[in-house]
Amino acid sequence: MTAQKMSAQEIIAFIGNAEKKTNVKVTFEGALAAALPENVVKLGNVLFGDWKDIEPLLANLTENKDYVVEQDGRNSAVPLLDKRNINARIEPGAIIRDQVTIEDNAVVMMGAIINIGAEIGEGTMIDMGAILGGRATVGKNSHIGAGAVLAGVIEPASADPVRIGDNVLVGANAVIIEGVQVGSGSVVAAGAIVTQDVPDNVVVAGVPARVIKEIDEKTQQKTALEDALRNL
């Protein structure tokens, strides 16, 4: 699913102007004495909505006044992505904010964190615990390893985001610094910290990362992706 592409300035405006909400789920006993506000949903003895709308209702419960509140944020500006119509595999525990693009047959593993404005290309896998910061872009058929970080850039608005090309492998726990571009076909070794742009079809490693060789047949075999993992 392709979200509308937003510039840094548009993202800043989106967050700044958004109504801040503390969404809660409240299970209560007793009866409500007041009418429900329009934006509060009641299913049986469970309420869903913003705490500022629900709190007054709970203050006026009749009979039994017991209730339990479940919440996962406070004054949140950006909701989580609605994943129902995305043609990709997204495992439980992935945290994906709204205004993220996830193309067909991509894979997002448990524990991955994807911030607003990020883009994940067709057939790309974001492994466990990887972080894609705001506006980070990954091309097609790439693999971002477990625990890797693609630094986000929302502020300052003039800064360039991280861009990863097609058919790139970023190893576990590697860090790609703000504004860096990694060329298509390249490999970033596990644990590398990439502070400068990486050309196409090379292997980089180290802290800071440096080119150690060009991609050869042996490297291609060791870093080949498995299409079966992307089947839906």
From Swiss-Prot:
GO terms for biological process: diaminopimelate biosynthetic process; lysine biosynthetic process via diaminopimelate. GO terms for molecular function: tetrahydrodipicolinate N-acetyltransferase activity. It comes from the Bacteria. Gene3D superfamilies: Hexapeptide repeat proteins, Malonyl-CoA ACP transacylase, ACP-binding. InterPro entries: DapH, DapH_N, Hexapep, Hexapep_transf_CS, Trans_hexapeptide_repeat, Trimer_LpxA-like_sf. It catalyses: (S)-2,3,4,5-tetrahydrodipicolinate + acetyl-CoA + H2O = L-2-acetamido-6-oxoheptanedioate + CoA. Pathway: Amino-acid biosynthesis; L-lysine biosynthesis via DAP pathway; LL-2,6-diaminopimelate from (S)-tetrahydrodipicolinate (acetylase route): step 1/3. Its EC number is 2.3.1.89. Keywords: Acyltransferase, Amino-acid biosynthesis, Diaminopimelate biosynthesis, Lysine biosynthesis, Repeat, Transferase. Belongs to the transferase hexapeptide repeat family. DapH subfamily. NCBIfam families: DapD_Ac. PANTHER family: 2,3,4,5-TETRAHYDROPYRIDINE-2,6-DICARBOXYLATE N-ACETYLTRANSFERASE (PTHR43300:SF10), ACETYLTRANSFERASE (PTHR43300). Catalyzes the transfer of an acetyl group from acetyl-CoA to tetrahydrodipicolinate. This is 2,3,4,5-tetrahydropyridine-2,6-dicarboxylate N-acetyltransferase. The gene is dapH.
